[in-house]
Regions:
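Glycine-rich, acidic/polar active-site loops that bind/position phosphate-bearing ligands
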Residues: 155-339, 348-354, 358-601
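Histidine/acidic residue-rich metal-binding segments in metalloenzymes
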Residues: 24-131, 135-151
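Short linear, low-complexity motifs centered on an aromatic residue
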Residues: 107-124, 142, 240, 247-249, ...
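Active-site-facing alpha/beta catalytic cores
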Residues: 12-56, 211, 218-236, 241, ...
Length: 740
C-alpha cells in the first residue's frame, strides 16, 4: 500500500538523519600498499615506449617512435604489426576488450567496448585485433554534440588513433586514445584541434628559436594541471536530488562555520579522505599519470591533486583519465566526487589551474630566464609574444574557459575575475619597462637564481624566484611559465589549450615576419628583435595588470583599456566567431569557420540545457519538498496559536503568539513567492524553448531563468532558517561540508 503523506514526510525526515548517522560511523577503507616502489609499478597498465620496444619489431618500433617524437607520418602498413604487439601485451595483462577512447564535445570522454574475439572459420572463436581496428572505427557522429555538422540520417563519423598518446588498460579493456571527426573531415572532439594547435605552436616557435639557436628542431608545449574537487559522503549526496542531478546545490543556507577560520587549507587530511587519495594515487601511477601533490583546499571538504607537468596532449588525456578515475575510486570509499566549479554557495569553488610553458628539444624552457644576454633576449621574446597573443585574443581566451558552471566561480572574489589580464610581477615588469623606454639596444643580463643582473644602472639586482603570487590574476607569470587560473575544475583543459597555443602560434608567426622585414632592410638581427619587442610592449600594455583583480576599480579600468568585460556567458561565446578569431584559427590550420560555427552551436545548446535542468530540478524540489515542509511547520505554528488562545486570556494569548504569527505570515509570504516564481519560471522556459536560434535561446535562459533561480533560492534559504530542523528533509550545508 502507498504510504500516507504524513508517513512519507516522516520517512524523508528520518532519511536525512539516518544518512548523517551512517556517514559519521564510516571508517576509512583499508588500502593495501603495493610491495613494489612507485617507480616500479609506474605505467604498469600503459603501452609505453618500454612495452613498445619489447612487443614490436625494431623497424616498427623505430617508425612509431619517430612518429611520436618528431611527428613523422606513420605508414599505414605497419599498423597491423603495432596492433599485433599491442594485442599480445594486452592479453597477457588479462584484457578481453578494446575501445577507441575519445573526447567529444560533451566535456567528458566516450568509449564503445568490443571484444577481441572473432570467428575462426571452424566453428570456434579466436582473438583478433588488426591494424584496421587499431587505426579507425566508425561511431555514430549524430549521437554526439556536432553543431549541425551531422544529421541522424548521415551519421557516419570516424575515430582515428593518436599514436602520440599511449594506449592504456582500464579493468579488462584496452583503451586507445583517438581523435573523433565527421565523415566530411570536420573535428567533432577536442583532441583533433588540440593536436593541430600544438603542431602550429611547434612550427612557429622553432622558426623564432632559430634566431637564437639554429639547432632547435622541435618545441613542445607543456601543461601542468592542478585539479581541485570536493568530496561528499555518498549517502548525503543521494539525499540531495540537486547534487545528484546538477552537480551543485541549488539551495542551502550558509553553515554557521564554513571557511572563515582558514583552518582547512593545508590542514591534516581526514582519514577516510587520505585512504581515498592513497588508492587514487596508486591507480593513477599504474596508468602512467605522474601525480605528485595532494592537500586540503580552502573550503571544507575541498581538496587538490596535481601531477608533474607533461607534454600538453598527454597531460590533457591524463586529466580526463584522472577525473574518470576519481569518480570510480571515490565510490569505493563511500564518497562522491564533485567536480562542479561551484557546488556550494558561500564557500570557494573549484578550478583547474593550467600551468603552460614551451620547451625545446635542446632542453631549454623558453619562458625561463637564461644565463647570458642572448638567452634573456630569447626569454623576453617569448614572454612578450605570449602577452601579445593574450592581449589580442583576451576575449577568445575568456570564451575558452566560460561555461554555465564556471560562471558561478569566476569573479566571485575567490577566483580570477572574468576579465583576462596578465600578472608579471615587479621584476619582469621593470625589465619590460626598461626595454620600452630605452633608446639603445641594451641586452638584458639575468643570472637565474643567483640574482637578476640587468647591466642597467637604474634597476637593482633582483631575485628571479621573487615573482609574487597574485591570486586575483587569471593569467600570471610564475617564474618559468604562465599559469592560466581561470580554467574550471570540470572543464576539458583542451578548450583553453587550443585557444592559447593557437593564439601564440599565430603571434609568433607575425613576429617572425616583422623581424625578417627589418633584417631585409639591413637592420642587425638583435636590433631588429629589440625594436619589434619594444613596439609590442607598448602595444599590449593594456593586458598587463599586477593589481587587485577583484576590485570595482579594475573593472572600470579594464573597460577603459578595451579589454573584454562581458559577463553573459552566451554572449562571451561570440568571441569564437569574430573575424580576427576565425582568421587566426584558419591561418594556423587549427579549425575552419564551419568547425567554429558548429562548436558555438554546441556551446550555446549545452549552456541552455544545463540551466534548463537546474530550473526543472529546483522547481520540483520547491514544490515537492520545500513548500510542503514549510506549510506543515506553518500548520504546527497555527495549531500552537489556537491552543494559546484556548489556554490564556485574549490579551496574553496575543502577546505570547505574536512571534509565531509573524513566522506564519513570513512562511505564507515566502511560499507564495516561491510558488508564483516557479510558475513564472516554467512559463519563461516555454517562451525561451520556442526560440529557434541556439544563441538567442541561450541568451534568453541567461537573462530570465538564471536570475529566477537565484530569487527562488533566496526565499528557500530563508525558510531553511525558520522551519524546524527536525522537519527539514534535505541534508544541510553543515552536514554536507563537515561530515567526513
Amino acid at each position: 500500500p502507498k504510504p500516507s503523506s504524513a508517513a512519507s514526510d516522516v520517512y524523508k525526515r528520518q532519511l536525512r538523519f539516518r544518512v548523517v548517522e551512517t556517514a559519521f560511523k564510516k571508517k576509512a577503507v583499508e588500502v593495501a600498499t603495493p610491495v613494489e616502489r612507485p617507480s616500479e609499478y609506474f605505467a604498469k597498465y600503459v603501452f609505453n615506449k618500454e612495452k613498445m620496444f619489447k612487443y614490436l619489431p625494431s623497424k616498427v618500433y623505430n617508425a612509431l617512435i619517430d612518429a611520436i617524437d618528431n611527428g613523422a607520418p606513420l605508414d599505414r602498413s605497419i599498423a597491423d604489426e603495432v596492433a599485433a604487439g599491442m594485442k599480445k601485451w594486452a592479453i597477457e595483462m588479462g584484457v578481453t576488450h578494446y575501445t577507441h577512447w575519445f573526447a567529444p564535445l560533451t566535456e567528458g570522454t566516450a568509449e564503445k567496448h568490443d571484444a577481441f574475439v572473432e570467428h575462426d572459420g571452424k566453428g570456434g572463436m579466436m582473438e583478433e585485433f588488426t591494424g584496421k581496428l587499431l587505426v579507425q572505427q566508425e561511431p555514430d557522429a549524430s549521437s554526439f554534440p556536432n553543431g549541425g555538422i551531422r544529421n541522424t540520417f548521415e551519421a557516419r563519423g570516424y575515430s582515428a588513433w593518436d599514436p602520440s598518446s599511449p594506449a592504456f588498460i582500464v579493468d579488462d579493456t584496452l583503451c586507445i586514445p583517438t581523435v573523433f571527426i565527421a565523415y566530411t573531415g570536420e573535428a567533432l572532439d577536442y583532441k583533433a584541434p588540440l593536436l593541430k594547435a600544438l603542431r602550429a605552436v611547434d612550427k612557429a616557435a622553432v622558426d623564432v628559436c632559430h634566431y637564437f639557436n639554429p639547432e632547435v628542431k622541435k618545441v613542445v608545449a607543456y601543461l601542468g594541471w592542478e585539479q581541485e574537487y570536493f568530496l561528499v559522503d555518498e549517502g548525503l549526496y543521494a539525499a540531495r536530488p540537486d547534487l545528484l542531478m546538477t552537480g551543485r546545490t541549488l539551495m542551502g543556507h550558509d553553515s554557521a562555520k564554513n571557511q572563515q577560520l582558514e583552518d582547512h587549507y593545508f590542514g591534516a587530511i581526514p582519514t577516510r579522505v587520505a585512504a581515498f587519495m592513497k588508492e587514487l594515487e596508486i591507480e593513477a601511477l599504474k596508468l602512467g599519470i605522474p601525480v605528485k601533490t595532494r592537500h586540503n583546499e580552502v573550503a571544507p571538504n575541498q581538496f587538490e591533486l596535481a601531477p608533474i607537468f607533461e607534454e600538453c596532449n598527454l597531460a590533457n588525456d591524463h586529466n580526463l583519465l584522472i577525473m574518470s578515475l576519481m569518480r570510480k575510486v571515490s565510490r569505493r570509499h563511500g564518497f562522491r566526487v564533485l567536480l562542479h566549479e561551484k557546488p556550494f554557495k558561500g564557500v570557494n569553488g573549484s578550478g583547474k589551474h593550467n600551468n603552460w610553458s614551451l620547451g625545446t628539444d635542446t632542453g631549454i624552457l623558453l619562458m625561463g630566464p637564461g644565463k647570458t644576454p642572448e638567452d634573456n633576449l630569447r626569454f623576453v621574446t617569448f614572454v612578450v609574444n605570449t602577452l601579445m597573443a593574450v592581449y589580442h585574443h583576451n576575449g577568445l581566451l575568456k570564451a575558452s574557459i566560460s561555461s554555465a558552471t564556471n560562471a558561478h566561480r569566476l569573479g566571485a572574489n575567490e577566483a580570477p575575475p572574468a576579465i583576462i589580464s596578465s600578472f608579471l610581477g615587479k621584476q619582469l615588469s621593470q625589465v619590460l619597462d626598461h626595454i620600452e623606454n630605452s633608446t639603445k639596444d641594451n641586452l638584458i643580463s639575468l643570472s637565474g637564481k643567483q640574482g637578476m643582473k640587468l647591466d642597467i644602472p637604474q634597476i637593482p639586482e633582483l631575485l628571479i624566484d621573487n615573482t609574487d603570487r597574485n591570486r586575483t590574476s587569471p593569467f600570471a607569470f610564475t617564474g618559468n611559465r604562465f599559469e592560466f587560473r581561470a580554467v574550471g575544475s570540470e572543464a576539458n583543459c583542451a578548450s583553453a589549450m587550443i585557444a592559447l597555443n593557437s593564439a601564440v602560434a599565430d603571434q609568433l608567426a607575425k613576429f617572425k615576419k616583422d623581424v625578417d622585414a627589418l633584417i631585409e632592410k639591413g637592420e642587425p638581427k638583435v636590433s631588429a628583435i629589440l625594436e619589434i619587442i619594444r613596439g609590442y610592449i607598448k602595444e599590449c600594455k593594456a593586458i598587463h595588470f599586477d593589481g587587485n583583480g577583484y576590485s570595482d576599480e579594475w573593472k572600470e579600468e579594464a573597460a577603459r583599456r578595451g579589454l573584454d568585460c562581458e559577463t553573459s556567458v552566451p554572449v562571451i561565446f561570440d568571441n569564437y566567431l569574430k573575424p580576427e578569431t576565425i582568421a587566426m584559427f584558419e591561418a594556423t590550420g587549427v579549425m575552419t569557420k564551419k568547425e567554429l560555427e558548429a562548436r558555438n552551436e554546441v556551446k550555446w545548446e549545452t549552456y541552455t540545457k544545463k540551466i534548463q535542468i537546474e530550473a526543472r530540478v529546483l522547481g520540483d524540489l520547491a514544490m515537492n519538498h520545500i513548500i510542503p515542509i514549510a506549510t506543515q511547520y506553518q500548520t504546527d505554528l497555527i495549531n500552537n496559536v489556537y491552543k494559546m488562545q484556548s489556554l490564556f486570556p485574549a490579551e496574553k494569548a496575543a502577546k505570547l503568539s505574536a512571534k509565531n504569527l509573524e513566522l506564519i505570515e513570513e512562511i505564507a509570504d515566502r511560499t507564495a513567492f516561491i510558488k508564483e516564481h516557479v510558475d513564472a519560471m516554467v512559463e519563461a522556459r516555454k517562451v525561451a524553448n520556442k526560440i529557434e536560434s541556439e544563441r538567442e535561446k541561450a541568451i534568453a535562459y541567461h537573462d530570465t531563468i538564471v536570475p529566477a533561480l537565484e530569487e527562488i533560492r533566496y526565499h528557500i534559504d530563508k525558510l531553511e532558517l525558520i522551519v524546524d530542523n527536525q522537519m527539514w528533509t534535505l541534508p544541510k550545508y553543515r552536514e554536507l561540508l563537515f561530515v567526513r
